[in-house]
Amino acid sequence: MEAVIKVISSACKTYCGKISPSKKEIGAMLSLLQKEGLLMSPSDLYSPGSWDPITAALSQRAMVLGKSGELKTWGLVLGALKAAREEQVTSEQAKFWLGLGGGRVSPPGPECIEKPATERRIDKGEEVGETTAQRDAKMAPEKMATPKTVGTSCYQCGTATGCNCATASAPPPPYVGSGLYPSLAGVGEQQGQGGDTPWGAEQPRAEPGHAGLAPGPALTDWARIREELASTGPPVVAMPVVIKTEGPAWTPLEPKLITRLADTVRTKGLRSPITMAEVEALMSSPLLPHDVTNLMRVILGPAPYALWMDAWGVQLQTVIAAATRDPRHPANGQGRGERTNLDRLKGLADGMVGNPQGQAALLRPGELVAITASALQAFREVARLAEPAGPWADITQGPSESFVDFANRLIKAVEGSDLPPSARAPVIIDCFRQKSQPDIQQLIRAAPSTLTTPGEIIKYVLDRQKIAPLTDQGIAAAMSSAIQPLVMAVVNRERDGQTGSGGRARGLCYTCGSPGHYQAQCPKKRKSGNSRERCQLCDGMGHNAKQCRRRDGNQGQRPGKGLSSGSWPVSEQPAVSLAMTMEHKDRPLVRVILTNTGSHPVKQRSVYITALLDSGADITIISEEDWPTDWPVMEAANPQIHGIGGGIPMRKSRDMIEVGVINRDGSLERPLLLFPAVAMVRGSILGRDCLQGLGLRLTNL
């Protein structure tokens, strides 16, 4: 029952596609048919004579009981059985679909389908039981079924049908007993266990002088493969028979796999990872020389095929050299029989030329393994020669290209190069650090030293991109978080040093201007003329505006607004802006974005620079080092900038530039449009024209 269910399920998947019934539904249908007496054995389902009674009975049951599940399942099974029956045009194909693949799911053969029902029921006792037992033995996945004679002479004695040659035990094939292929242990034994049905003419004859050799495995449906390949385009006459070790016998290759591989080579190329994966899957099991050469004719053009033949010959010569040194080499059959040679490995020895059956019978398992491995290695070499990869050293991340796309191009080029596998990972990581965009380079340099593989670097960059964008604003936000604790530590230390036992912040003395004490505690004891005088700047008592200690630090503020006594604010956490970097203690440096708003075509529309806030400069000056070379400039009315060191030549921007200061959270202040000066100075300067337009004061920084 289980074997029949597997056969029917495979046939339904082949001919019904996605709507094929499940094994559970097929088993329920077979159980119902046996219960109703429509089938004496599950294998009777292959007989066309039982199809009409089953259809009528299930239709009547559906109308009476209203249950159409079994009828629907039977409709799909019936369609698959009819399609399989129509496709069997020769007895060799019938054997394949009968299940000679050793448990491989196969549609029914003509011996079970075309046999009349009256002939099956001559003797309802012993004869029917014998037929059922024979069918169950054919469908068993553990054993190979013995095909019936098709009316031809015996290949051993030459007599007509009915000879007893098959009853005698035949010698095992030459490679039986080898530990390389345990699944082939029962191939030769089945020949002597066929009962009264000898091997027919459809089985391949043994070569002269090798009468005891086992016949070759089942062949692929050549006509079907020709049709499949003809519809896809490649000019191929025939296809190889790929033999794999799946189960107790070798089985032919699916034509759809060959068709898909040919299409992949045309669309993806030979170096594609998809192509290599499919070729390795097809050649994962031993192939005959006939199989290998035909497969390469399909996927390679004339020139690559010629290169492959030469490379294959070199690989086979290496195998022969190793087999010559070691008599027990697997290609020599573990010391049994003659040593291997180039003619045997290429399928050119006596009885092998153009004869895949002879190759399957005469070649040893170790030779098949060497042939397949050499062919695959030669294919890899030809793929590198026929389609050379682009130089990985020239790959650079584009301005608008994502890091993932850049990594894909780089890894593909490095893996397709001639670099040894051990050197590919360090090369990829080094290219990440040098060929990526500047923001990503800075992020990778800050990565932990424990990241040692390309995958870890890629994951690190992607994780950081999710947290904050890889721009100057994002980096500014990250740096602000790191600097904030340092600033707070400095503030708290200064505050603790200037705070008395009462906890009040101690400021400058009104009398002497010294820190650390009040006016009442001043040792000079000098009092102002009017101790109750109110200051016009800070709104404090006991001093005037001229004596105010905040006079130099609050120019331009309205009196009495937002001021408090003491030298530090009362708030617990002072406002810290990343616009001022901490590497210059007394120089207010800010991060600025410059955007060219002109219509002149430029390579980079926006740039990021570091500039100095200088209230002593009349105008904004951009250094020649920070100014992009393709941004247009013009001669200014005043060709020089005058300072303490003398005059410096300058030019002026032809286009209007948008200037924006970056805050610590990555946001921008209100931008300003101006025509900055460009000069050869040591650093860019934001002058009073920019400070007034942006509303910036040095006291706020």
Curated annotation (Swiss-Prot):
Positions occupied by motif LYPX(n)L motif: 180-184
Enzyme Commission (EC) number: 3.4.23.-
Any GO BP annotation: viral translational frameshifting
Active site, renumbered: 614 (for protease activity)
GO cellular component: host cell nucleolus; host cell nucleoplasm; viral capsid
This protein's UniProt keywords: Aspartyl protease, Capsid protein, Host nucleus, Hydrolase, Metal-binding, Protease, Repeat, Viral capsid assembly, Viral capsid maturation, Viral matrix protein, Viral release from host cell, Virion, Zinc, Zinc-finger
Biased segments, Basic and acidic residues type: 124-141
Pfam families: Gag_p24, Retro_M, RVP, zf-CCHC
Protein name (database record): Gag polyprotein
Organism whose genome encodes this protein: Avian leukosis virus subgroup A (isolate RSA) (ALV-A RSA)
Lineage summary: Viruses, Riboviria, Pararnavirae, Artverviricota, Revtraviricetes
